[in-house]
Regions:
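Cytosolic nucleotide-utilizing catalytic cores of signal-transduction proteins
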Residues: 2-203
Length: 203
């Protein structure tokens, strides 16, 4: 249905559409109690077959909404134009599948992007980290962790050491190993590929 057709339907129903809607997923039993504390224009779905409740909150002040949901098992999607509220709902669903600990999807965009195509991500990891495959699993794991910290801390050895709880000399030794395994480690294309490959820890 086109946005114009949706608007006509909303007007016929006597509903004034907001500029945006934010989807909130939470247990169905919590939907009504939370709804009573929110904007009265909030739409409630609490009769879905999987016992999930959905709130569609109009023009939400995100920080206020998150405070209102404190202590609740809730996932908050992004604000979207009301005609695209399904996109907010879809992201909240994906976030909940990714981790039960996610509350605000806006705080987990890198994980959501990297997990959007699990098959492509697995292929990327396999290709990018192929030089580690010949090593014992424990060694490969240590080197991958070091590589991840080195990339995320932009090669600052003391910060890498602090992140890994090791001595800076240990980082120096491991990075020497990694440079042998990845001779093109200074290549921007290689850095991008490796950063993506190690950016999300595999489940």
């Amino acid at each position: 249905m086109s946005p114009d057709a949706l608007l006509v339907s909303a007007q016929r129903a006597g509903w004034q559409p907001p500029d945006s809607l934010t989807a909130v997923l939470l247990p169905a039993a919590q939907a009504r109690p939370v709804y009573r504390a929110l904007d009265p224009g909030t739409l409630v779905l609490d009769d879905l077959p999987d016992a999930t409740g959905v709130l569609l909150v109009p023009d939400a002040d995100r920080s206020h909404l998150l405070r209102q949901l404190s202590g609740r098992t809730a996932v908050v999607g992004p604000a979207r134009p009301w005609t695209h509220a399904s996109a907010s709902y879809a992201r909240a669903v994906r976030a909940r599948l990714l981790s039960p600990d996610i509350r605000d999807t806006e705080g987990h965009l890198p994980e959501l992007v990297l997990s959007a195509d699990a098959d492509a991500f697995a292929d990327l990891r396999a290709r990018a980290l192929a030089p580690l495959r010949a090593l014992p699993a424990a060694t490969a794991g240590r080197l991958e962790g070091t590589l991840r910290a080195w990339l995320l801390h932009q090669g600052r050895r003391d910060e890498v050491a602090a992140a890994l709880f090791v001595h800076p000399q240990t980082v120096r030794y491991r990075m020497a190993q990694l440079r042998e395994l990845f001779p093109d480690l200074a290549s921007p294309d290689r850095v991008l590929e490796l950063t993506l490959a190690v950016g999300l820890r595999p489940s």
